[in-house]
Amino acid sequence: MAPRPQKKLFTRKKVCRFCADKELVIDYKDVKVLRNFVSERGKIIPRRIVGTCASHQRQLCEAVKRARQIALLPYSGSAQN
């Protein structure tokens, strides 16, 4: 049996949206922006999935944690039974 040919998958390089748009600022009070980086369960989405650079991912984590602490974001997602 001949080996199966490998399919070439084209993966698009993710660009950090904060590096691309210099006017977009990471702020713990801006809940609309922070919700894009938090999963339905309330977990912070990793940078390999979101596509942010390392420095902005660190800033995002700090902002999400601050927003959680002052109750702008929930610690866990909405519990739907």
Swiss-Prot record:
GO terms, molecular function: small ribosomal subunit rRNA binding; structural constituent of ribosome
One Pfam family hit: Ribosomal_S18
Keywords: Ribonucleoprotein, Ribosomal protein, RNA-binding, rRNA-binding
GO biological process, one term: translation
One of the record's GO cellular component terms: cytosolic small ribosomal subunit
Gene3D superfamilies membership: Ribosomal protein S18 (4.10.640.10)
InterPro entries in UniProt: Ribosomal_bS18, Ribosomal_bS18_CS, Ribosomal_bS18_sf
Coiled coil: none
Signal peptide: none
Domain of life: Bacteria
Assembly and interaction partners: Part of the 30S ribosomal subunit. Forms a tight heterodimer with protein bS6.
Family membership noted in the UniProt record: Belongs to the bacterial ribosomal protein bS18 family.
Function (record text): Binds as a heterodimer with protein bS6 to the central domain of the 16S rRNA, where it helps stabilize the platform of the 30S subunit.
PANTHER family: 30S RIBOSOMAL PROTEIN S18 (PTHR13479), SMALL RIBOSOMAL SUBUNIT PROTEIN BS18M (PTHR13479:SF40)
Protein's recorded name: Small ribosomal subunit protein bS18
